[in-house]
A protein has these predicted regions:
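Eukaryotic helix-grip
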Residues: 1-280
Length: 280
């Protein structure tokens, strides 16, 4: 059974601010989760052009996070089978990620994201069919809330109480009850997650586990977007691209893959039209 769920994450940012925040948080959280044995290896990061998405940046990454897998899954899957590969096409305000696992060749997870300057009440922003809408679940995530489930523990939990936090640089916060309907600026990340694990006996259980993991990741990363606002506020996309380039090199060096570190990042000037990749 294919799971389809749309997560709506309302943020107290403008669309322009959120783009910077997300880039910064992804970079920092990848650094925090990468050690000499596990973490994120960046295979490639380069410009792309696509008829549907326009221009953006394509990235290919390998996630070696075997220790974060549920115990029940590790009982019948080897550590190498739990390595996953992500391809992502970021043409902000539209993004798409496709995640596959070589150890489970039929498994596929896609995350389609559309960002809008609203407070989470837009319907069917992804243009789903009637059949897809009937199967889709919708959940609005409140970043001022906290979670204590298994996946929140695995992903990590911020100790910052956003109901009390106030940004020193912007004066924003705290996020009190009803903040999503009152704050300005405001925007929403509409994340449509589709998971298909067509394996008899454990496929449904793994689909549910992965969806719970995605929810925990969305909550924690977006809580960090606001909790770390004084770190990223004022940065430009050009500054962030340079920081990303340095971070990607550092990640690959941490994992002992200097060759990947040297070749992973390609600038627009270095990218030929023939080498650009379209969205899958």
């Amino acid at each position: 059974m294919v799971l389809i769920k749309e997560f709506r994450i309302v943020m107290p940012f403008s669309l322009e601010e959120y783009e910077i925040a997300q880039m910064y948080v992804v970079m920092k959280m990848q650094q925090q989760s990468t050690t000499g044995n596990e973490g994120v290896e960046v295979l490639q990061s380069r410009p792309f052009t696509d008829a549907e998405f326009g221009e953006g940046r394509y990235t290919s990454k390998i996630y070696r996070l075997q220790s974060k897998a549920p115990t029940w899954l590790t009982k019948f899957a080897s550590p190498n089978a739990l390595v996953v590969r992500e391809e992502a096409w970021n043409a902000y305000p539209k993004c798409r990620s496709v995640i596959k696992c070589p150890g489970f060749s039929k498994f596929i997870m896609t995350v389609d994201t559309i960002h809008k300057a609203d407070n989470g009440y837009s319907e069917n922003v992804h243009g789903l069919s009637k059949q897809q809408l009937a199967a889709r679940q919708v959940e609005i995530i409140d970043i001022a809330s906290a979670a204590s489930d298994y996946w929140s523990y695995i992903v990590g939990r911020s100790t910052v109480d956003l109901s009390k936090f106030k940004s020193a640089r912007t004066g924003r916060g705290p996020l009190l009850k009803g903040w999503k309907d009152q704050c300005n600026p405001v925007m929403t990340a509409y994340k449509l997650v589709t998971i298909d694990v067509p394996y008899w006996g454990f496929g449904g259980k793994l689909e549910q586990a992965l969806m719970a993991g995605e929810r925990a990741l969305f909550l924690e990363s977006h809580r960090n977007c606001f909790a770390w606002i004084d770190e990223w506020f004022g940065l430009t996309t050009e500054m962030m691209h340079e920081l990303e380039r340095e971070s990607d090199y550092s990640l690959n060096m941490k994992l002992g893959r200097p060759c990947s570190a040297e070749r992973s990042w390609i600038t627009p000037e270095e990218s030929s039209i023939g080498g650009e990749k379209s969205v899958a």
